[in-house]
Amino acid sequence: MKKFTCVQDIGDLKSALAEAFEIQKDRFKYVELGRNKTLMMIFFNSSLRTRLSTQKAALNLGMNVMVLDINQGAWKLETERGVIMDGDKPEHLLEAIPVMGCYCDIIGVRSFARFEDRDFDYQETILNQFIQYSGRPVFSMEAATRHPLQSFADLITIEEYKKTARPKVVMTWAPHPRPLPQAVPNSFAEWMNATDYDFVITHPEGYELAPQFVGNAKVEYDQMKAFEGADFIYAKNWAAYTGDNYGQILSKDREWTVSDRQMAVTNNAFFMHCLPVRRNMIVTDDVIESPQSIVIPEAANREISATVVLKRLIEGLE
């Protein structure tokens, strides 16, 4: 594997899942694989689970790890071509990227959507600059449009907990006080569409995701109807995608907060969320603290998904 930015990069999902469950049983099975290999993790945005789980995955494989927080201990970086650099950014990303590539074997990049220009975001400008100019395999630790490490962990979790071969999985929008990127819901939809699950997306009108991510999923604007008979509920906020509303909050309707009321019509569904979660905005205390909440095992599987991805990237170096 030469890069990891979307579900297509992982190849056959059954094979990837088999590898994930193998690593779950013995996390240090491939500890010699990464000997004398260096991972560089580059963060343009904050992180808890991604930072810790990816570092742990690299250690599982015997790698050296370097972490760089852009704009915190490093020069501020200009990201756009054609800019007259007479401001507070003394270095351009197009010089910084190949320099970073000199010091490592694999690069992970975390760079969120800015919500200033949809084309800039959805062209994955920053991530693709790393792919083009670093000379190293690059993987996404959440980019403007996708969060594949999270989605792979979500898939592992569903496969662990499902009680039927073809579960009903519902991704629901929920309110949040701040506008959040579409990366997690886009990516989750992309990965669910790559399975044979019964996959439903529910959200208020105006929160439609980009068609290439919705794919063949059923879109239901009635949340209660969408929840009926569900085996898994995946809650997530996202800002508007369409038109002039891109990046905006259109609603904070707490009727969409996942509570016992909605969960009562499910098939005793498991509750999932990528974390961090705003309690009593996204989900009530009772639901996230219930026995059906699997947000912690879901987070634990971030280490597993990252280990599989790094293992395959290392193997691709040979």
Curated annotation (Swiss-Prot):
Q: What is its EC number?
A: 2.1.3.11
Q: Which Pfam families match?
A: OTCace (PF00185), OTCace_N (PF02729)
Return the broad EC class. transferase
Q: Keyword annotations for this protein?
A: Amino-acid biosynthesis, Arginine biosynthesis, Transferase
Per the UniProt record, the site (Key residue in conferring substrate specificity for N-succinyl-L-ornithine versus N-acetyl-L-ornithine) maps to P90
| Residues engaged in binding N(2)-succinyl-L-ornithine | E142, H176, K236, R278
Does the record carry Repeat as a key word?
A: no
Pathway terms, separated by semicolons = Amino-acid biosynthesis; L-arginine biosynthesis
UniProt GO MF annotations: amino acid binding; ornithine carbamoyltransferase activity
Reaction(s) the record says it catalyses: N(2)-succinyl-L-ornithine + carbamoyl phosphate = N(2)-succinyl-L-citrulline + phosphate + H(+)
Family the UniProt entry places it in: Belongs to the aspartate/ornithine carbamoyltransferase superfamily. SOTCase family.
Q: What's the stated role of this polypeptide?
A: Catalyzes the transfer of the carbamoyl group from carbamoyl phosphate to the delta-amino group of N(2)-succinyl-L-ornithine to produce N(2)-succinyl-L-citrulline. Is essential for arginine biosynthesis. Has no activity with either L-ornithine or L-aspartate as substrate. Also has no detectable AOTCase activity, being unable to convert N(2)-acetyl-L-ornithine to N(2)-acetyl-L-citrulline.
Name used for this protein in its record: N-succinylornithine carbamoyltransferase
Transferase recorded as keyword = yes
* Binding residues for carbamoyl phosphate: S47, L48, R49, T50, W75, R110, H147, P148, L149, Q150, C274, L275, R302
Complexes and interactors: Homotrimer.
Against InterPro entries, the record matches this protein to:
ArgF'-like, Asp/Orn_carbamoyltranf_P-bd, Asp/Orn_carbamoylTrfase, Asp/Orn_carbamoylTrfase_sf, Asp_carbamoyltransf_Asp/Orn-bd
